[in-house]
Regions:
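Short beta-strand/loop segments at the ligand-binding rim of alpha/beta enzyme cores
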Residues: 3-9, 58-65, 106-116
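A structural signal for short coil/turn segments at secondary-structure junctions
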Residues: 58, 82-83, 106, 130-133
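Catalytic cores of alpha/beta
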Residues: 17-24, 72-82, 121-131
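Catalytic beta/alpha-barrel core
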Residues: 33-36, 63-70, 78-98, 110-121, ...
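Basic, often amphipathic N-terminal segments
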Residues: 2-56
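Conserved small/polar residues in nucleotide/adenosyl-binding loops
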Residues: 141-147
Length: 151
């Protein structure tokens, strides 16, 4: 997975109005949090309505579902209904084996794996995943840097 370009993803969308305003600005990807304990969590039904609207009006914007430590069968069953997300972003402790299994089950969906970076040594966690995922959103903790996406 060599770095090819930088993308802009706006995440934590909770309404159609937010999604459309952000889409109008020209973002590359819009993310919805599918993690129950998140304050920005929205239901699968509401997410599907937002993603359908985006798919119809802005088909080139990636639609990202952010999940955390979800069983693979739950992702397949609960998150990939019509209209399909274009990307699943893993934001938990998912290991390489998990990434391989998920990619095998849904080969046509992009797979991103997020990493929390607190120091330079944390960057070493990324390398082993490079051949098993499509992009790496990197969040810096305790730094004043924005989240970056390596694709």
């Amino acid at each position: 997975m060599p770095k090819t370009k930088t993308l802009v993803k706006i995440c934590g969308i909770t309404s159609i109005e937010q999604a459309l305003q952000i889409a109008e600005l020209g973002t590359d990807a819009i993310g919805i949090i599918s993690v129950n304990e998140s304050p920005r969590y929205i239901s699968s039904e509401k997410k599907k309505v937002i993603f359908k609207t985006l798919k119809d009006l802005y088909p080139n914007i990636e639609r990202v579902s952010v999940v955390k430590n979800s069983p693979i069968d739950s992702i397949i069953k609960g998150f990939l209904g019509e209209p399909n997300e274009t990307i699943i972003q893993l934001h938990g402790d998912e290991d390489i084996d998990y990434c391989q299994k998920l990619k095998k089950r849904i080969p046509d969906i992009g797979l991103w794996k997020a990493f929390r970076i607190k120091n330079k040594k944390d960057l070493e966690k990324i390398k082993p995943y490079e051949n098993f995922i499509d992009a790496i959103p990197v969040s810096y903790t305790h730094l004043t840097l924005p989240t970056i996406l390596l694709v």
